[in-house]
Every structure is written in C-alpha cells, then in structure tokens.
C-alpha cells in the first residue's frame, strides 16, 4: 500500500501484521521493516513512494494505491511491485480514486499506457479501480 505522507500511512495501520516504510524512518528501522516483511513476520507493507523504486520484494501479488500517484512513472514503479517474475499469481493493482479525480485517472491511463477498468463506486467519495 502506498500513501502520500507518513502521517496518512501511520494513521492507516490496522493490524499487528502490518508494517510501514517511509522516508521519516531512520535507515536501521527501514532495514528491520524489510527484514520482517521478507521473513513473513508481517503480511502487509504500508508505504510512501520511498518503497516504489529499487526494492526487491518477491511474492507481492497485490498493490493498493490508496492515493493517486503523482506521475505515470511513479504509478509504474508502484504497480511493478506486483506480478514480478516468480510470483505464483498475476499481479493486481488497485487504485482508490474519488469521482472528482476522473480527469486525473484518464491522464494516468494515457501517460502510463494502461487501461484502468472501473469496478465499483463506493458512496460519494471513493472508487475502486483495477489495473493489470
């Protein structure tokens, strides 16, 4: 999961088997977070875009974009955490977006060269979108 800020990220941790990774963490804490994820001590990584690039996280099957990525490049790197070689299942990427962000979603589709399928509208504020 990706959030725009460390404050949003920390506010959204819900279970014991969730860990977080963001730029405000000192490097030893980041290393411990990744070690816990790789060892299976935690199931879910809630992260800011600090985790979008350069991390080898095998076995990731689902990426949830809780906030719109700032660019198509960021989207591609976030989504690239799922469906990597060696994954048992194809990767799925969920993008949570408000209805008033439809133009932003369309722009993301064009720039990232992806088709985003609208699945369901939830209330007045959120939309779940699947890509992949």
Show which residues each predicted segment covers.
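Conserved helicase RecA-like core
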Residues: 1-132
